[in-house]
C-alpha cells in the first residue's frame, strides 16, 4: 500500500470539480461550511463551464452522511447558505467575508439570483441522505425501472434479532455437548448475552478471514479431544521424568535462590499430583514455567539444557494456549449469521448493513443502474468519510472512479475516526487515500481560541507519528484572527488553555484514580461556579464577554459508569448535571408503569384492583387521595369510575394519544411534583409513550392487544428502538455530561476530560494486514497478532483523545496519574503509555512517576499547559428557586431518584449501601462452608445439599403455589420443573420427598398443615400496595425495628434515601384456620448441613440478620389494612392469627418441628409503624 499522497491546502475556487477529491478537515476548520461553499459552486457553475454544460440543480447534487442528525444539520446549513448567498446577490454586499469573496466570483448577478431563488424553492427535493436511506432510495429506483418488488421491512436496530439468534445458538449447540466441554465453555461465556457481547464486533466486519473450519458439534468435540490428548501426552511424559528432574536441575549451575531444594520439591510434587489426576479440562499449572528450557537456560551459567526433552515439552505445552474460546467465537459467528439470514428471509426483514451489500451487488451486476445513478447525480459529497467501511467505499468508487464528467468529494478527518464499534473502518479510509494522488486539507481553526489551538498543536507535535499510522499525519491548525480575544478568566487572570490534574502517587489503581479525579473535577467546577456568582469567572467568545454559567461546561466520559461517578461528586457539592447520552428506554421509567395502570383501569373502570393500582399513579393523585380516605363515599367512587368511562369514550373517538393529552391538561392544575420542571418531564414522558402507543395501535384490532404490547414493552429489558429513548429535558443551567462518541461535532467553552488515562487492552486478535488492509482473526491469539490488534486499539484511543480535546473552545482540564493496571512486585513504571493520553505525552515509552513529571514540565514551559495536583473543596450553593432542577436531574438519572414519589418494597428498604467488614467475612466463611460441605457430600443427595441459590427458591415457591394440585402430580412433573429451573433431574426423588414433608408438617400445636388448608380459604402470592403518605426516613424505621426486636441493634442499620409513595410486596400465603387469618412466608435459606442448624436459636439469628421482623411487620400492616376494609366487625386481636416463617430446608422429617418460626406482632407496634408510614 502506498503511504504518502501529495497534499495541498484547499482553495474553494481552484479545486477542480471533476474526479474523486479527498478533503481532510481537522476539528473546527469548517468542514460543513466547506461543503456549503462547494455546493454553491456547483449550483452557480463557477469555474467549471467546460465540464458541466448547465448549472446543477439541488436534486442533482447528492450529499451523503452517516446519521439523521448530521443529515438534518447539513440540510439546514445548505439551505441557510443558499439564502445568505441570495441576499448577498440582492444587496450586492454582506458582512460575511466568505460570501463577499464568493460574490466577486459571480459574473452574472441576475442569473445567480434566479438560480439561488430556484434552489431555495427546490430544497424540499434536495438529495441529502444518510448512507442507508440513500441505499434504500436507489434500490426503490431499481424496483421502479426493473419492475422488481422490494417488499422487505427495514429494521434500524438489529440488537434484539442478534440476541434471539445467540439464544437459539446457545440452546441448539451447547445443550447437546458433553458436560466436560460445557464446563470449559462456561469459563469463557456465562450466558448468551455474554457471548453476544464478545462476538458482536465480528458482525460489523465485512470479509473477515477466518482460519478455522469447525462448523458443527462433532468437529468441536474432536478438537476438544485432540487438546485433551496433548495434555495427557505431556502428563505421561512428566510422570516418566519427574523423579530425575530435581537431580538434573541440581547438577546445573543454576540460580539457587529461585531453584532452591524447597521450591523444587514443592513444584515437582504439585505438578506430579496434577499429572496423576484425570484430565477433563485444560488446566495447566502455572509453576510449570520454571521447568521450561527458556527459563532454565536464563537462570544457568552455561545456558544449556537442550538435551533434556521434558524441558522443551514444558515450553511447548505452555505456548499452546488450550482454549475453546476462539473456536467458539468463529463457530458462533458463522452459525448466528446463518440463523439471522434465515430469520430475516422468513420474516421479510432487512437490516441497514444488508442494504449496502444488496446495492453493491446490484451495481456490480447491472451497468444500467450504475449509469442511471451517475446521470441522476453528476456531483456527490460523502460527509464524515472517515466513518466509512469497505462496502460504502466500493459503492461510490465503482460509481465515480472512471468518470471525468462527474465529481465525488470525500470529506472527513481520519483523526476523528472513533466508531469502529459500529463498523466504521479507518483502514477503508486509508485504502481510499492510498488510491488518490493528491488530497486537500483545511487548516484554519474557526472554533477555538488561539491559545487552545497552540496548546493542542504543541501536544500532538511531540511525536513523529502522533496517531501511530504514518498516513494519518497531524497538520498544525492556524487559529483564526477573529478568535484573538477569546478567553477564560478568573479574577481577571487568563486561565491556561490546558490543565493536567496529576495525582501525586507513584502507583495508582484505576479505582483509586477514578475516585480522586471525580472529586478534583467536581471541586474545580464548584470553584468556577462560585467565582461566577460574584462575577469573577468570565468567558469571552465570538458573542462577546459574559459571566460563566453551568451551561458553558461539559464533562466528557466514555460510558454511563464514568458519568455516574462524576454526577455523584457534583451532587455532593449541590451542582446540577445532565447525562446527555442517556439511552434508557422510556418504557423502563416509572411513568410508563403509572400510565399502564391508568390505561388498564380505563378498560375496566369497575375492577377494584385495577382502580386501586391506577390511584397509585401521580397523575391521578388527587383522586387517589379521595380513594385512600377511610370514609370514602359512594358519590366519590361513582365520580372516579365516571371519569374513567369518560376517558374510555375519548380514547374510542379520537385515539389514545389525544386522550392522554386531555388527561394531562385536566390534571395539570393538581401538580404532582414539588416544582413545575419535574411535572414537565413526567408530562413529556407520558406524551412520548402516548405517541408510541398511537403509532402501534394501527397494528391491533383491540385495545386490550395494545395493553398487552405495552405490558410486554415494560417487562422486557431490551435495547430501546431508535424512537424509544428518553427525551432529555434541557432548559435550565446545568453541567453537560456526555460521551466522547456523542460529543463529536459539538463544541463547549470549557471541557473536562477526567478519565482519559483508562484503557482496555485488546482481548480479540482482530487485526488488519498493513499492506493489503484486509481484516484477519487469529484463533491462536499469538502475541504477534494480539500486539497488532492492541496497537490498532491504542491508535483509536489517541483519536478519542483528539476528539475530546478539540471540543473545547477556551479551556480543557484533563486527569492524569501513574496508573498501574496490574500490580507486580518491584515494578517501577506505570501503564499509562498504553492509553491515548499516556502515549501522546510519553511517546509510547514506559515511565515512572518522576519520568512522567519531567515530561509534563517540558510541556508546560510555554505557558500553554499547566500541571495541578489538588483543588480545594468548594460547596456551590444555589438560589432557592433552582430546587426544581434537582428534581429534573434525578429523574433523568434514574439511579439517583431522591426526594420524589416512588414505589418501594421491603427488599429495597433492606438494601445496605456497604456491608461491614465483619459481615463480609461472615458471608465469605459461610460460602466456603457451603462449598466444602458440597464437596464432602457429593455422593449423598439430601435436601441439605440440594442446589442453593435464587433459582431454587423460585422453583420451590412455584411448586407451593400449586399446593392444591400437588397430589395429582407424578415424578415426570417434578422432573420437568427441575429442568425448567436448570437443576439436574437426579434430584427428582429428593424434591418429591422434600415437598411431601413440607406439606404434611404441622406448623403448630393446633395441627395447622398445608395439605389440609382449603383452597377457598387461602390466597397464594397476594400482592399488596398501600401508600407511604409521610416521608419515610431510615433513622426512624431503625428505631421501630429495635423496639420490635432489641437484638436487632447488633445487625447493620438500614440506610436508604427518604421515600414517599407506595409500599408494595407479595405475601406467599394468607389462609384462614379456625376463623383466624394467618400469614405464611416460605424461606429457602441454607443455614447449615443438617436439621440442627434450624433450631429456634439459629432461626432467630437469621431473622435479625435479614431483618425479617421488618418484613413481617410490613406484611401484617398490609393484611391488617385489607381485613379492615373487607370485614365488618374486624378486630386485630380476635381475627388475626399471626405470622409463620417456614424455613423449608429444615423439613427433612415431618416429625421434627425445627425450621418453623411463629410470632404474633404486637398491635401497639403495628399502630406505631402505620403512623410512621401513613
From Swiss-Prot:
<feature type="domain" description="UvrD-like helicase ATP-binding">
    <location>
        <begin position="4"/>
        <end position="449"/>
    </location>
</feature>
<feature type="binding site">
    <location>
        <begin position="25"/>
        <end position="32"/>
    </location>
    <ligand>
        <name>ATP</name>
    </ligand>
</feature>
<dbReference type="Pfam" id="PF13361">
    <property type="entry name" value="UvrD_C"/>
</dbReference>
<dbReference type="InterPro" id="IPR011604">
    <property type="entry name" value="PDDEXK-like_dom_sf"/>
</dbReference>
<feature type="region of interest" description="Nuclease activity, interacts with RecD and RecA">
    <location>
        <begin position="900"/>
        <end position="1174"/>
    </location>
</feature>
<feature type="binding site">
    <location>
        <position position="1081"/>
    </location>
    <ligand>
        <name>Mg(2+)</name>
    </ligand>
</feature>
<dbReference type="GO" id="GO:0000724">
    <property type="term" value="P:double-strand break repair via homologous recombination"/>
</dbReference>
<feature type="binding site">
    <location>
        <position position="957"/>
    </location>
    <ligand>
        <name>Mg(2+)</name>
    </ligand>
</feature>
<dbReference type="InterPro" id="IPR011335">
    <property type="entry name" value="Restrct_endonuc-II-like"/>
</dbReference>
<dbReference type="InterPro" id="IPR014016">
    <property type="entry name" value="UvrD-like_ATP-bd"/>
</dbReference>
<feature type="region of interest" description="DNA-binding and helicase activity, interacts with RecC">
    <location>
        <begin position="1"/>
        <end position="852"/>
    </location>
</feature>
<feature type="active site" description="For nuclease activity">
    <location>
        <position position="1081"/>
    </location>
</feature>
<comment type="similarity">
    <text>Belongs to the helicase family. UvrD subfamily.</text>
</comment>
<keyword id="KW-0540">Nuclease</keyword>
<keyword id="KW-0347">Helicase</keyword>
<dbReference type="InterPro" id="IPR014017">
    <property type="entry name" value="DNA_helicase_UvrD-like_C"/>
</dbReference>
<dbReference type="GO" id="GO:0005524">
    <property type="term" value="F:ATP binding"/>
</dbReference>
<keyword id="KW-0547">Nucleotide-binding</keyword>
<keyword id="KW-0378">Hydrolase</keyword>
<keyword id="KW-0227">DNA damage</keyword>
<keyword id="KW-0238">DNA-binding</keyword>
<dbReference type="GO" id="GO:0000287">
    <property type="term" value="F:magnesium ion binding"/>
</dbReference>
<keyword id="KW-0067">ATP-binding</keyword>
<feature type="binding site">
    <location>
        <position position="1068"/>
    </location>
    <ligand>
        <name>Mg(2+)</name>
    </ligand>
</feature>
<dbReference type="InterPro" id="IPR027417">
    <property type="entry name" value="P-loop_NTPase"/>
</dbReference>
<keyword id="KW-0479">Metal-binding</keyword>
<dbReference type="InterPro" id="IPR000212">
    <property type="entry name" value="DNA_helicase_UvrD/REP"/>
</dbReference>
<dbReference type="GO" id="GO:0009338">
    <property type="term" value="C:exodeoxyribonuclease V complex"/>
</dbReference>
<keyword id="KW-0460">Magnesium</keyword>
<dbReference type="GO" id="GO:0003677">
    <property type="term" value="F:DNA binding"/>
</dbReference>
<protein>
    <recommendedName>
        <fullName>RecBCD enzyme subunit RecB</fullName>
        <ecNumber>3.1.11.5</ecNumber>
        <ecNumber>5.6.2.4</ecNumber>
    </recommendedName>
</protein>
<comment type="function">
    <text>A helicase/nuclease that prepares dsDNA breaks (DSB) for recombinational DNA repair. Binds to DSBs and unwinds DNA via a highly rapid and processive ATP-dependent bidirectional helicase activity. Unwinds dsDNA until it encounters a Chi (crossover hotspot instigator) sequence from the 3' direction. Cuts ssDNA a few nucleotides 3' to the Chi site. The properties and activities of the enzyme are changed at Chi. The Chi-altered holoenzyme produces a long 3'-ssDNA overhang and facilitates RecA-binding to the ssDNA for homologous DNA recombination and repair.</text>
</comment>
<keyword id="KW-0413">Isomerase</keyword>
<dbReference type="GO" id="GO:0008854">
    <property type="term" value="F:exodeoxyribonuclease V activity"/>
</dbReference>
<keyword id="KW-0234">DNA repair</keyword>
<dbReference type="GO" id="GO:0043138">
    <property type="term" value="F:3'-5' DNA helicase activity"/>
</dbReference>
<feature type="domain" description="UvrD-like helicase C-terminal">
    <location>
        <begin position="479"/>
        <end position="745"/>
    </location>
</feature>
<dbReference type="GO" id="GO:0016887">
    <property type="term" value="F:ATP hydrolysis activity"/>
</dbReference>
<dbReference type="Pfam" id="PF00580">
    <property type="entry name" value="UvrD-helicase"/>
</dbReference>
<dbReference type="GO" id="GO:0005829">
    <property type="term" value="C:cytosol"/>
</dbReference>
<comment type="subunit">
    <text>Heterotrimer of RecB, RecC and RecD. All subunits contribute to DNA-binding. Interacts with RecA.</text>
</comment>
<dbReference type="InterPro" id="IPR004586">
    <property type="entry name" value="RecB"/>
</dbReference>
